[in-house]
Every structure is written in C-alpha cells, then in structure tokens.
Amino acid sequence: MEPEEGTPLWRLQKLPAELGPQLLHKIIDGICGRAYPVYQDYHTVWESEEWMHVLEDIAKFFKAIVGKNLPDEEIFQQLNQLNSLHQETIMKCVKSRKDEIKQALSREIVAISSAQLQDFDWQVKLALSSDKIAALRMPLLSLHLDVKENGEVKPYSIEMSREELQNLIQSLEAANKVVLQLK
C-alpha cells in the first residue's frame, strides 16, 4: 500500500530503510538543540523544497507524540501508511530518545518567557527606627536579583516586609507546582 500524500510522514517512504535510523536520530538531535541533518546527505532522495517538508513533518511528529504522551498503539495507527521497516525504526527512535525530546519540549516552553532568573542574593535587616516611628524593630528582607532578559542581565533590588515575603514565597510555590506538572 503506497502512502497517501498528506498523511503524516508520507515523504519518508522515499528514504531507503538503511538510512532511516541515521536521519531520524539527526532530526531528534536537532529538536534537542544540536545540529539537524543537512540536505547534501539526502539530495539524491528528495528535492530541496521537499526536504524542508520532510524535516518539518518528522520534527512535528516527534514533538506531537512525545508531547501528548501517546501510547504505542496510537503511534502505530499514525504510521500505518509506512512500510514495516520505517515503522520499526521510528518506534525504536521514539523509545530510545523519548526523555531527550521531552526535555527539549520543556526547554522550549520555558524559553517562551523572555526573562529568566540568573542569580540572587538576600539579606535580613532589622529596621530599628524610622523618621516617623522611634522604635520599629521590624525585620526587612533585601533581595537582589539578576534577571536575564533578551540576552542582557539586569539587576533588581527589592526590600520587603515579612508579609510581602510570605506573598512572594506563596507565588513562587504556586509557580513551582505548575512547572512540576509540565514535567
């Protein structure tokens, strides 16, 4: 059965089976932030424009099945148009590199936020008095943050009371729960 144009990965059928593992692992390398495969290695199989579609389709496929955490049966259903050698190769790649793809997807999500905390420092100070009240005896937290935004590190300094610190901690704990749910 010939794969139909428009089904996932139909262009992969042109690839000789012995080149499948090499191509798929290089595409996963690209997803993980390393080098994607180069057209020169596959110019005898696909035209230039078709090559771009191959890369895009396979990368989307891997991201989708790992991101959705699809079971093997559902993955095989999506691959039923391909020959058994290509199906087997894809499944081996997915099983062996699933964790790497998942980490790459997490990094992509984290990178959506343009600002990232690079470093921090804190001190607790005791305010003994102010110009309005003779004796305060109130603990204050001085928090110094180095935030990387658009490649540039910007320093921020914040002074907080006990209540403000408690609110910050609660917000950070809530954000941490969301991050843990993404893993």
Swiss-Prot record:
Compartments reported by the entry: Cytoplasm; Nucleus
A Pfam family the protein falls into: COMM_domain
InterPro entries: COMM, COMMD4/6/7/8, COMMD8, COMMD8_HN
Domain COMM: start-end pairs: 116-183
Major subcellular site: cytoplasm
Keywords: Cytoplasm, Nucleus, Transcription, Transcription regulation
Any GO BP: signal transduction
Tissue: Widely expressed with highest expression in thyroid.
Function: Scaffold protein in the commander complex that is essential for endosomal recycling of transmembrane cargos; the commander complex is composed of the CCC subcomplex and the retriever subcomplex. May modulate activity of cullin-RING E3 ubiquitin ligase (CRL) complexes. May down-regulate activation of NF-kappa-B.
Stated name of the protein: COMM domain-containing protein 8
Organism name: Homo sapiens
